[in-house]
Regions:
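Bacterial N-terminal signal peptides that target proteins for export
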Residues: 1-9
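Bacterial N-terminal signal peptides
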Residues: 8-20
Length: 190
């Protein structure tokens, strides 16, 4: 284990043990994206950035620690723009969540014009499983760059030809992301 990870390990243990429910969760059920005629999992949660942008987050029942956000969203990219087309809860019943629960004044499908970021689409076989967030590593990752809802870039990374981060590195990365998400939820509730 590299020196900096040895120093961070006790901190990570303390954070994991003291962090409430969402950040101590398991690998997550991903959102879905219809892209080029194929429905694929995305290891990104674009809707969370909408809530982080001062819009109140409705209550979504959490049916599982594998779905800390309480919903699974289905997206599509059509004519270079990203749209939210469907939401369902994470309970055993997988009930449909009306998009109007979040977007009262927008037509469906909802154009994701609030989202700027990167969508990660895993491809190929899993090289390393990480039991947290979206930390697992696959043979390839397709990264789609979105700016204000518009697809502006696409890049494939071949993980078989690059150094695969250690499980500790992936876990620290996922813990950091989950902690940021949790902090944003708390801030929006205040």
């Amino acid at each position: 284990m590299p020196g900096f990870l040895k120093m961070l390990f006790p901190l990570v243990v303390v954070v994991v043990l003291m962090t409430p429910y969402p950040a101590s969760s398991t690998a997550q059920h991903p959102d879905r994206l219809v892209y080029k005629g194929e429905t694929v999992p995305i290891f990104s949660n674009p809707l969370e950035t909408f809530f982080d942008a001062s819009h109140r987050r409705p209550y979504f029942p959490r049916g599982s620690t594998a779905c800390w956000r309480g919903y699974i969203a289905t997206w599509k990219i059509e004519n270079e723009y990203m749209y939210l087309v469907r939401m369902q809860d994470c309970t055993q019943e997988k009930k449909e969540i009306p998009l109007a629960t979040v977007f009262q004044d927008r037509p469906e499908p909802v154009k994701a014009d609030w989202f700027s970021g990167t969508l990660r689409i895993p491809r190929g076989n899993m090289l390393r499983y990480v039991h947290m967030g979206y930390g697992s590593v696959y043979e390839r990752d397709l990264f789609l760059t979105i700016e204000k809802g518009k697809l502006v870039g696409e890049q494939v990374v071949d993980n078989t030809k690059t150094r695969v981060p250690s499980e500790d590195e992936r876990a620290i990365d996922e813990l950091t992301k989950l902690k940021e998400w949790e902090d944003n939820i708390r801030k929006n509730r205040e």
